[in-house]
Amino acid sequence: MADSKSISPTDITDCFFHNLRAQVRPGDRLTVALSGGVDSVVLLHLLTTFSESMQLEVSAVHVEHGISTYSGEWSAFCQSLCDSLAIPLSIHRLKIRRRPQESLEAIAREARYQIFKHIQADYVMLAQHQDDQVETLILQLLRGAGVKGLSAMPTVRLLEPGKTIRLFRPLLNIPRSEILNYARLHGLSWVTDESNLDTSYDRNFLRHQILPLLEQRSPAYRKTLFRSTQHLGEAAHLLDELAEIDAENTLVTNRLSLQGLRKLEPARARNLLRYLLAQRLIRLPNSTKLEEILRQLNNIQPDNHFRFIVDTLEIRCHRGLIEFLPADSLPEPIAPVVWQGEQHLVIESLQGVLKFTRQNNMGIDPARLSGQIVTIRSRSGGERFQPDCKRPRRSLKKILQEAALAPWVRNTLPLLFCEDQLVWVAGIGIDCNFQISEGSTGLVVAWHPSQINQVSTH
């Protein structure tokens, strides 16, 4: 884009429209993260300029962190602004508490993003601009970040895995000075956060103490450093493409082959692991922790179990295959649940659904269950099972081990009991004593993990 000194408000409008049109489509729902500061006020003003012609559904969200004594006034300002523009606004009030070794800025950002995840929108619009991007680059340099971190903030990214809502920063290539010019030209009002002057925060110290000196020596530093973030973004994209190639060669049914990972050169192994973690949108580990994960993976025996927690993710390895599982969603063994003939039985503690259907020549003999108490529960130990009538009854533990199921899967498989007799084991089969005779209609049970929200009970 042109040098910031030559940009007029009209050019800013054109630049914003270009950024917007390149990403959104008619009918998209856009929610502005509105703090009340000049950046987000200008973003909302620009967006309302084009919302009707582009057929966009615009709303706003304000998060009151409760950190400043003025936070209530800022909420009232945002409400008044949105009322004047006929823009729906949702206000969320929080109490932010400091955590050891974490900045207040990072804690507040995490809290905001948790709220954003529940917004009914296609995009959450953020008002970060070119100066913010340059500051982020310098702060990342001071932290010793790699290529991914030095590419700073992406213009667009998914907010969380498996969802469609995205974060969008349409002002990222526009300097702060021109945003201020636009606000003054259009007579906009905004609030000022007094904490922006507190130089105990690294970003504020950089903004007020360091960058003015840098500008004296290199007036165009914003433009040149912003260009560096773009170059680094391209390099990060190429590293992601390399990781995708390595992933294709090392992934086995969505699990990472330990042997395949070990065959890679150390730099490529680090790149692949970093990429797979980033795909799950967690806070990436620093280089020391990443090296420790790889060291342990390189030293364990293929038959050994491995567990390592990174942010909200748990890395587990079993029989040479590495899985990435949400640490807070690993199910616990369940208490007995009585089945009363439902077609769908939700097992919330196991995060899945049992589906019961009738089919010819297969399944459980319904007559064996008639008049009996049928329950679903997890293993308690000592169960014996005979899914193959040509083989003797054996311990369920041994059968599950032979099926190469990971220990954390074995302990949370749903089992169907008729009174005290084990009838069916998910993924294994039906006990001989309960299998349907040929020519009859049987009850087929199927286990569908992670489908709680996809079915209704009958």
From Swiss-Prot:
It is found in: Cytoplasm. InterPro entries: Lysidine-tRNA-synth_C, Rossmann-like_a/b/a_fold, TilS/TtcA_N, tRNA_Ile_lys_synt, tRNA_Ile_lys_synt_N, tRNA_Ile_lys_synt_subst-bd. One of its GO terms (biological process) is tRNA modification. Its EC number is 6.3.4.19. SMART domains: TilS_C. Keywords: ATP-binding, Cytoplasm, Ligase, Nucleotide-binding, tRNA processing. Belongs to the tRNA(Ile)-lysidine synthase family. PANTHER family: TRNA(ILE)-LYSIDINE SYNTHASE-RELATED (PTHR43033:SF1). Ligates lysine onto the cytidine present at position 34 of the AUA codon-specific tRNA(Ile) that contains the anticodon CAU, in an ATP-dependent manner. Cytidine is converted to lysidine, thus changing the amino acid specificity of the tRNA from methionine to isoleucine. This is tRNA(Ile)-lysidine synthase. The lineage of its organism: Bacteria, Pseudomonadati, Pseudomonadota, Betaproteobacteria, Nitrosomonadales.
